[in-house]
Amino acid sequence: LSYTTLFRSGSGTLLDSARLQCHIADCIDVDPKSIHAYVLGEHGDSEMIPWSTVRVGGKDIYQIIKDNPTRMNEGMFESIHEAVKKDGWEIFNRKGNTCYGIAASTTRIVRALMFNESVVLPISTYLDGQYGQDGVFTSVPAILDATGVKEVVEIEMTKEEKEQFDASCSHLQSFYKEV
């Protein structure tokens, strides 16, 4: 790995995405490994969830809700999102740190790099026109292999989701200007 490869990406929302998968899995009583869902944008208050892309065993989340209305409904989206954002703080307040979650995320990234996995992970990387964004490091699905970020995977989002993503990127850009 080159020095520049290591510093053009970060853990981003990988941990938040894992927490999201666990929350959804708890609602519908399936293994989190069966959930395909991402938290994108900033790792923080402006992060967003493109619910239209969430899949459970390949099945659209809205179809899951339709088929299982007693287990999950769209009204739960906001509470799940808030729980994902607050999970880290709850862990920190209880134990004084959150070292295991970020260690697991870092281990996942290192494994992808070391073993040339070409795996799609929601990590922070530099956008150069992807998603209509330029000059911002933010979390998006990216193919990670031994060279680092091989490719940014652009997923389709609804208009509202894209607006949320753009707002998150704008928030990050405004922070860059302050620094």
Language model segments and positions:
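C-terminal substrate-binding/catalytic lobe of Rossmann-fold NAD(P)-dependent dehydrogenases
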Residues: 7, 14-179
